[in-house]
Amino acid sequence: ITRFARFAGLAGLPAVLPPFANAAWLSVVPEFNPFKYNSFPVNGARQSYRLTDALQSQIQRLARADQLGSLPPVLTFQSVIDFTVSTPAILTALYANLPDNGSEIVLFDVNRTLKFAPLLRPASYVAIDRLAPTEPATYRFTTIANANDDSEMTVERSIAPGQLQAAVRPLNLPYPPGIFSLSH
């Protein structure tokens, strides 16, 4: 959640007047996805920001006091092209503060087979590389991706805590037909 979300409440102020009731929503769009709401209320944005800000402050405070040692392992599944939750923020605000306790982030790469190439931005092809640890980390960094650009078969590339080299394991599973990104 960006820092600008703290101002979301201002966008809803006109909603106190009946002709401007729609101002209570940041976006109102048709609801076609049974697994996710498409419309988003201003109060939802404000509450999301407040919760995220409080959690980040608490994580940073506990990390500085070296009190995260008793935290159970954290397991996160994330698509590298998910724009709802920032993958770099997960890595910097959460995982960079975690102790070596068995935590793992699992990132789903885009389906790199040629049939989807026209749909993807060039930045999509380097997202995993930009997110991979450049120095040993305290958590396992795992990606699920195509075995290569010509294959629909997937592999797991996993960098163990304290390491920089990925171990590759074939999953013997293809990307589902017609899917260009696996997500949450």
Where do the model's predicted regions map?
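Serine-hydrolase catalytic core
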Residues: 33-184
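Hydrolase active-site cap/lid region
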Residues: 2-50, 72
